[in-house]
A protein has these predicted regions:
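A short, terminal or domain-edge coil/loop segment
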Residues: 6-9, 15-18, 143-155
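Charged, low-complexity, helix/coiled-coil-prone segments
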Residues: 2, 14-26, 135-142, 182-197
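Short, charged surface segments at domain edges that flank catalytic/cofactor-binding sites
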Residues: 155-198
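Short, surface-exposed, polar/charged, turn-prone segments marking secondary-structure boundaries
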Residues: 60, 66-71, 117-119, 132-136, ...
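Phosphate-binding glycine-rich loops and adjacent basic patches that engage nucleotide phosphates
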Residues: 36-42, 151-160
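Conserved beta-strand residues within beta-sheet cores
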Residues: 87, 102-104, 192
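Acidic, glycine-rich low-complexity segments with interspersed aromatic residues
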Residues: 2-99
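Compact mixed alphabeta submodule
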Residues: 94-154
Length: 198
């Protein structure tokens, strides 16, 4: 399959993406030198990152799970994508093994740094990339957002009070908003779970 044949909103497998772009999906940012692209994956099931959506814009967290993130490798590639000729493409995962193609994105503002917990729960600096779709991305299904919330809420029930309080305090109450049938705020499952225990 050619990159230009990808359809917005369609579901693709890991193998289809790998063969189309010429890169492996080892992380949330995957560079392909053969197609001069950067494949960005927002995995709502497994990721430790907390990307924030604002309709057709997303503030995407950079690569690096432990300690302060550095502006090197794929992070550098994305930060210089306005001038280096690399084209970023974004996929979302709501179910394991299913990658929904959202389209090409570009930086609409300068990357910035903020505090966010790492894989071990320690506070660290991450790079945030303000991205906007080159086209009008399709609204997502309401059920996809609800399924993610339910999955994260279920996981939050297994955390200790201390872990839950930490997660609730380290994230905003509202994680962003997405267009579904109407604009819907994404709730923070850790705040909800922590509030129910009080």
């Amino acid at each position: 399959m050619q990159i230009e044949n990808l359809q917005l909103g369609n579901i693709y497998s890991n193998e289809e993406i790998r063969s189309t772009f010429g890169c492996s999906l080892q992380s949330g940012m995957n560079k392909s030198n053969s197609t001069n692209t950067l494949v960005l994956i927002i995995n709502h099931i497994k990721s430790i990152y907390h990307d924030r959506w604002f309709n057709n814009k997303v503030h995407h967290i950079g690569k690096g799970q432990i300690g302060d993130q550095e502006l090197t490798r794929e992070n550098k590639t994305l930060s210089e994508s306005k001038s280096n000729g690399v084209v970023p493409h974004l996929f979302e995962v709501f179910k394991t093994g299913e990658y929904i193609y959202r389209g090409q994105v570009h930086l609409y503002d300068k990357p910035y740094q903020k505090q966010q917990p790492d894989k071990n729960g320690d506070s660290r600096l991450v790079w945030v990339f303000p991205l906007k779709f080159n086209n009008n991305s399709r609204p997502i299904n309401h059920s996809e957002i609800e399924n993610v919330f339910k999955t994260q809420f279920k996981k939050s029930q297994k955390l200790s009070n201390e872990e839950l309080e930490s997660k609730a305090n380290n994230l905003p109450d509202i994680l962003g908003y997405r267009e579904v049938a109407t604009i819907r705020h994404q709730r923070n499952p850790y705040v909800v779970s922590y509030t129910l225990r009080r």
